[in-house]
């Protein structure tokens, strides 16, 4: 199997996001890489499900709360940008202050 660098990046995001999901289910707080991976994964999956950029940007601030991440993480993650594939092409989705 030959994967492009972009495909490898997406697989790494999915792996980290699945770990983050398991930790959230166990009641653990996410660190910086886990929080970013989780948010990125939800954008990628939302695009795959047919949601549009505006909806994902709006929903993005509801996916993680301050109580679900380690201290100081909301301030570190002031913006998350991820390129996602939509039915009409690849678009950049930006989540502003996604952890509230």
Swiss-Prot record:
Q: Which keywords appear in this protein's UniProt record, sorted alphabetically?
A: Cytoplasm, Hydrolase
The pathway it acts in is: Nitrogen metabolism; urea degradation; CO(2) and NH(3) from urea (urease route): step 1/1
Q: What is this protein called?
A: Urease subunit gamma
Q: From what organism does this protein derive? A: Synechococcus sp. (strain CC9311)
Query: Any keyword Hydrolase?
Result: yes
- Gene Ontology CC, one term: cytoplasm
Q: What high-level taxonomic lineage is stated for the organism? A: Bacteria, Bacillati, Cyanobacteriota, Cyanophyceae, Synechococcales
**What is the annotated quaternary arrangement, including any partners?**
Heterotrimer of UreA (gamma), UreB (beta) and UreC (alpha) subunits. Three heterotrimers associate to form the active enzyme.
EC number(s) reported in the record = 3.5.1.5
Q: Which reaction does it catalyse?
A: urea + 2 H2O + H(+) = hydrogencarbonate + 2 NH4(+)
Q: Which residues form the signal peptide?
A: none
Q: Which family does it belong to?
A: Belongs to the urease gamma subunit family.
- What Gene3D superfamilies does the annotation carry? Urease, gamma-like subunit
Question: Subcellular localization, per the record?
Answer: Cytoplasm
Cite the GO molecular-function annotations of the record. Answer: nickel cation binding; urease activity
- What biological-process GO terms show up in the record? urea catabolic process
- Give the primary localization class: cytoplasm
- Cystine bridges: which residues? none
By its UniProt entry, which InterPro entries does this protein fall under?
Answer: Urease_gamma, Urease_gamma/gamma-beta_su, Urease_gamma_sf, Urease_subunit
């Amino acid at each position: 199997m030959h994967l492009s660098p972009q495909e490898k990046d997406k697989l790494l995001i999915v792996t980290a996001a699945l770990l983050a999901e398991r930790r959230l289910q166990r009641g653990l707080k996410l660190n910086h890489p886990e929080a970013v991976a989780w948010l990125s994964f939800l954008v990628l999956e939302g695009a795959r499900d047919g949601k549009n950029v505006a909806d994902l940007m709006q929903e993005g601030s509801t996916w993680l709360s301050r109580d679900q991440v380690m201290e100081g993480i909301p301030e570190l993650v002031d913006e998350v940008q991820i390129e996602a594939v939509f039915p009409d092409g690849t678009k950049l989705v930006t989540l502003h202050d996604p952890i509230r």
